From Swiss-Prot:
It is a multi-pass membrane protein. Belongs to the UPF0391 family. It comes from Albidiferax ferrireducens (strain ATCC BAA-621 / DSM 15236 / T118). Keywords: Cell membrane, Membrane, Transmembrane, Transmembrane helix. Its main location: membrane. This is UPF0391 membrane protein Rfer_1875.
Length: 54
């Protein structure tokens, strides 16, 4: 459990550096594009799973 706490603390520090450093503003557009791509892939995977069961 302590291992997970340390890992999430390090991730939070890295996110804070990006957020306070101004890098986050330029990464927003990349994040939006990646969200759309992975949402489409998730829906496609779900549909292919339903089709394959039949």
């Amino acid at each position: 459990m302590l291992h997970y706490a340390v890992v999430f603390f390090v991730i939070a520090l890295i996110a804070a550096l990006f957020g306070f450093g101004g890098i986050a503003a330029s990464a927003v557009s990349i994040g939006k594009i990646l969200f759309i791509v992975f949402a489409i892939l998730a829906v496609a995977s779900f549909l292919f799973g339903l089709i394959k069961k039949r």
